[in-house]
Protein backbone atom coordinates (compact mmCIF):
# COMPACT_ATOMS: atom_id res chain seq x y z
CA UNK A 1 0.00 0.00 0.00
CA UNK A 2 2.76 2.42 0.96
CA UNK A 3 4.72 1.58 -2.19
CA UNK A 4 1.60 2.23 -4.32
CA UNK A 5 1.09 5.63 -2.68
CA UNK A 6 4.73 6.58 -3.29
CA UNK A 7 4.51 5.41 -6.90
CA UNK A 8 1.37 7.49 -7.42
CA UNK A 9 3.05 10.55 -5.91
CA UNK A 10 6.12 10.12 -8.13
CA UNK A 11 3.92 9.67 -11.18
CA UNK A 12 2.09 12.92 -10.43
CA UNK A 13 5.16 15.05 -9.72
CA UNK A 14 6.49 15.29 -13.30
CA UNK A 15 3.10 16.35 -14.66
CA UNK A 16 2.81 19.02 -11.95
CA UNK A 17 6.27 20.30 -12.80
CA UNK A 18 5.42 20.41 -16.51
CA UNK A 19 2.27 22.42 -15.79
CA UNK A 20 4.26 25.49 -14.81
CA UNK A 21 5.10 27.45 -17.92
CA UNK A 22 5.50 31.05 -16.76
CA UNK A 23 7.11 32.76 -13.83
CA UNK A 24 5.99 36.30 -13.03
CA UNK A 25 7.66 38.74 -10.66
CA UNK A 26 5.68 41.91 -9.90
CA UNK A 27 7.13 44.77 -7.83
CA UNK A 28 5.27 47.93 -6.77
CA UNK A 29 7.00 50.89 -5.10
CA UNK A 30 5.50 53.89 -3.29
CA UNK A 31 7.14 57.36 -3.42
CA UNK A 32 8.66 56.83 0.05
CA UNK A 33 10.63 53.85 -1.30
CA UNK A 34 8.47 51.16 0.31
CA UNK A 35 8.01 48.25 -2.06
CA UNK A 36 6.12 44.97 -2.21
CA UNK A 37 6.68 41.94 -4.42
CA UNK A 38 4.32 39.25 -5.70
CA UNK A 39 5.09 36.15 -7.69
CA UNK A 40 3.25 33.85 -10.09
CA UNK A 41 0.04 32.32 -8.82
CA UNK A 42 -2.77 30.54 -10.63
CA UNK A 43 -6.51 30.02 -10.58
CA UNK A 44 -8.27 27.84 -9.41
CA UNK A 45 -8.93 28.49 -6.63
CA UNK A 46 -10.49 31.91 -7.15
CA UNK A 47 -7.97 34.50 -6.05
CA UNK A 48 -5.11 32.03 -6.29
CA UNK A 49 -3.21 30.19 -3.60
CA UNK A 50 -1.01 32.97 -2.20
CA UNK A 51 -2.10 35.92 -0.04
CA UNK A 52 -1.50 39.27 -1.75
CA UNK A 53 0.95 41.76 -0.28
CA UNK A 54 -0.40 45.25 0.50
CA UNK A 55 1.34 48.49 -0.50
CA UNK A 56 0.25 51.64 1.35
CA UNK A 57 0.32 55.07 -0.32
CA UNK A 58 -1.62 58.34 -0.49
CA UNK A 59 -4.02 59.75 -3.05
CA UNK A 60 -2.04 61.65 -5.66
CA UNK A 61 1.04 59.43 -5.20
CA UNK A 62 2.68 57.91 -8.25
CA UNK A 63 3.12 54.17 -7.76
CA UNK A 64 5.93 52.65 -9.83
CA UNK A 65 5.49 49.04 -10.83
CA UNK A 66 7.48 46.56 -12.84
CA UNK A 67 6.83 43.01 -13.91
CA UNK A 68 8.98 40.42 -15.59
CA UNK A 69 7.45 37.30 -17.10
CA UNK A 70 9.73 34.35 -17.93
CA UNK A 71 8.87 31.36 -20.11
CA UNK A 72 10.09 28.54 -17.85
CA UNK A 73 8.58 25.82 -20.04
CA UNK A 74 11.82 24.35 -21.42
CA UNK A 75 10.38 22.51 -24.41
CA UNK A 76 8.31 25.02 -26.31
CA UNK A 77 8.00 28.65 -27.28
CA UNK A 78 4.92 30.60 -26.29
CA UNK A 79 3.43 31.77 -29.59
CA UNK A 80 0.87 34.56 -29.88
CA UNK A 81 0.61 34.65 -26.08
CA UNK A 82 -0.30 37.80 -24.24
CA UNK A 83 0.03 39.64 -21.02
CA UNK A 84 -2.38 42.13 -19.50
CA UNK A 85 -1.84 44.45 -16.57
CA UNK A 86 -4.28 46.74 -14.83
CA UNK A 87 -5.15 48.70 -11.71
CA UNK A 88 -8.81 48.55 -10.67
CA UNK A 89 -10.73 49.55 -7.57
CA UNK A 90 -11.92 46.68 -5.37
CA UNK A 91 -14.12 46.49 -2.28
CA UNK A 92 -11.68 45.05 0.25
CA UNK A 93 -8.08 43.98 0.81
CA UNK A 94 -7.50 40.37 -0.19
CA UNK A 95 -10.72 40.21 -2.20
CA UNK A 96 -10.75 36.79 -3.90
CA UNK A 97 -12.78 37.57 -7.02
CA UNK A 98 -11.38 40.01 -9.57
CA UNK A 99 -13.67 43.06 -9.58
CA UNK A 100 -15.42 44.13 -12.79
CA UNK A 101 -12.85 45.68 -15.10
CA UNK A 102 -14.70 48.98 -15.39
CA UNK A 103 -13.22 52.43 -14.79
CA UNK A 104 -9.66 51.10 -14.75
CA UNK A 105 -7.07 53.44 -13.26
CA UNK A 106 -4.44 51.99 -15.61
CA UNK A 107 -4.21 49.16 -18.10
CA UNK A 108 -2.02 47.76 -20.80
CA UNK A 109 -1.49 44.61 -22.81
CA UNK A 110 0.69 43.16 -25.49
CA UNK A 111 1.07 40.03 -27.59
CA UNK A 112 4.37 38.21 -27.97
CA UNK A 113 6.26 35.08 -28.99
CA UNK A 114 8.56 33.98 -26.19
CA UNK A 115 11.26 31.32 -26.55
CA UNK A 116 12.08 29.01 -23.63
CA UNK A 117 13.84 30.89 -20.79
CA UNK A 118 13.21 34.24 -22.50
CA UNK A 119 11.80 37.18 -20.51
CA UNK A 120 9.44 40.03 -21.23
CA UNK A 121 8.19 42.86 -19.04
CA UNK A 122 7.67 46.55 -18.52
CA UNK A 123 8.03 49.40 -16.03
CA UNK A 124 5.12 51.76 -15.52
CA UNK A 125 3.97 54.53 -13.19
CA UNK A 126 0.40 55.24 -12.24
CA UNK A 127 -0.93 58.16 -10.21
CA UNK A 128 -3.53 56.98 -7.72
CA UNK A 129 -6.35 59.52 -8.05
CA UNK A 130 -8.51 58.78 -5.00
CA UNK A 131 -8.38 57.04 -1.64
CA UNK A 132 -9.57 53.43 -1.72
CA UNK A 133 -8.55 49.82 -2.11
CA UNK A 134 -7.15 48.84 -5.51
CA UNK A 135 -5.90 45.69 -7.21
CA UNK A 136 -2.69 45.78 -9.29
CA UNK A 137 -2.69 42.61 -11.37
CA UNK A 138 -0.61 41.14 -14.19
CA UNK A 139 -1.97 38.06 -15.98
CA UNK A 140 -0.90 35.80 -18.82
CA UNK A 141 -3.27 35.29 -21.75
CA UNK A 142 -3.56 32.77 -24.58
CA UNK A 143 -0.66 30.61 -23.39
CA UNK A 144 -2.34 27.51 -24.88
CA UNK A 145 -2.05 25.61 -21.62
CA UNK A 146 -4.74 24.41 -19.22
CA UNK A 147 -4.44 27.46 -16.97
CA UNK A 148 -3.09 31.02 -16.88
CA UNK A 149 -0.80 32.67 -14.38
CA UNK A 150 -1.04 36.00 -12.59
CA UNK A 151 0.69 38.07 -9.93
CA UNK A 152 -1.15 40.67 -7.85
CA UNK A 153 -0.61 43.30 -5.16
CA UNK A 154 -3.29 45.15 -3.22
CA UNK A 155 -2.91 48.94 -2.99
CA UNK A 156 -4.36 50.71 0.04
CA UNK A 157 -4.57 54.39 -0.86
CA UNK A 158 -5.39 56.88 1.91
Residue ranges, per PLM feature:
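Positively charged n-region of N-terminal signal peptides that target proteins for export
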Residues: 1-4
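Bacterial N-terminal signal peptides
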Residues: 7-13
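Sec/Tat signal peptide C-region and signal peptidase I cleavage site
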Residues: 15-19
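Contiguous segments within soluble domain cores/interaction surfaces
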Residues: 20-30, 43-123, 135-148, 154
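Post-signal peptide N-terminal segment of mature Sec-exported envelope proteins
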Residues: 32-35
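Residue-level recognition of secondary-structure-to-loop junctions
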Residues: 128-129
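Extracellular interdomain linker/stem segments of modular secreted and single-pass surface proteins
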Residues: 156-158
